[in-house]
């Protein structure tokens, strides 16, 4: 297998730099990068408004999922009453479709779980100390102060954790659920990129 055929999936703490890592890996491997682009693709493919997806993006639904499996064969086009479970199933369907097209970098959206049985998967979790996360959040303009940034980070982490745990039955951020965990604050972006690339090329050599 070629390294460029690897499916790199990045879970991340809010403000940890996981998206920046994903974009750099995408450039180095010349493969597509999917983050919120997944929402656009899912919305377009299934005829559901983008705001509908964005409202439910990485947020735990208020109802128990009852349609996840069956929804893979559904196309509720233009529905104004599509629930979170169906949106999750449709997004998962898009992830699987994109994975069949070749190598890619996916950020979030439980893509590591959706693709868990794919031998080309390399799953990563990115974390960082709170001070580093706060600095990054302020620098990109999401907040004005460190205190506001920390509050935003913690709130978004709770949402991601609830969403991930609900749909996967796994524990978000638990090292046992990922192939590689990286402290981006300690290692820095370029070192992290080098580590993941090394793992990617090693995985490619071992898969025929």
Where are these regions (language model features)?
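Glycine-rich phosphate-binding P-loop
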Residues: 10-26
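Pre-Walker A (Motif I) flank of P-loop NTPase domains
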Residues: 3-8, 12, 102
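Short beta-strand-centered segment that lines the nucleotide-binding/catalytic pocket of NTP-utilizing
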Residues: 32-43
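C-terminal helical "lid" subdomain and adjoining coupling/linker elements of P-loop NTPases
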Residues: 204-208
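Small-molecule kinase domains that catalyze NTP-dependent phosphoryl transfer to phosphate-bearing small molecules
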Residues: 63-68, 144-190
